[in-house]
Amino acid sequence: MAKLTILIALVAALVLVVHTSAFQSSKQSCKRQLQQVNLRHCENHIAQRIQQQQEEEEDHALKLRGIKHVILRHRSSQEYSEESEELDQCCEQLNELNSQRCQCRALQQIYESQSEQCEGSQQEQQLEQELEKLPRTCGFGPLRRCDVNPDEE
């Protein structure tokens, strides 16, 4: 009986060591992948989305105040094409990351770099919302247990 207990303890310890080693390896692999991937397209896409939202809110506020001659902001087909291209390239880059955990870390990195440029908490909220929508927009569904703002408590 004592030998069986020792054997079970050894097997459990071995499983724990293998699991820990695999986790560390995957963590290092993600770090390498994040260094190799260019998240600029995602940053550009998110910045464009926030800019569009602000313009729409400004236009709506002017309309509510009774200003009837609002200058309508028309985006050209070239602008739509550029936005679409940024999104496509962003999705491609995120898709190259081999795990949801790594994709989440990429979104956190984007948040960290973009939040410094936000002017106020409303823009930070928009940034967070856009980053949370990005995986679904790219077609790989929401990331489970991913808080794009790691500083938020």
Curated annotation (Swiss-Prot):
The keyword Calcium does not apply. GO terms for molecular function: nutrient reservoir activity. It is found in: Endoplasmic reticulum. InterPro entries: Bifun_inhib/LTP/seed_sf, Bifunc_inhib/LTP/seed_store, Napin/2SS/CON. Disulfide bonds join 30-102, 42-90, 91-138, 91-138, 104-146. Keywords: Allergen, Disulfide bond, Endoplasmic reticulum, Signal. Expressed in developing cotyledons (at protein level). One of its GO terms (cellular component) is endoplasmic reticulum. Residues 1-22 form the signal peptide. Belongs to the 2S seed storage albumins family. Heterodimer of a small chain and a large chain; disulfide-linked. This is Conglutin delta 2. It comes from Lupinus angustifolius.
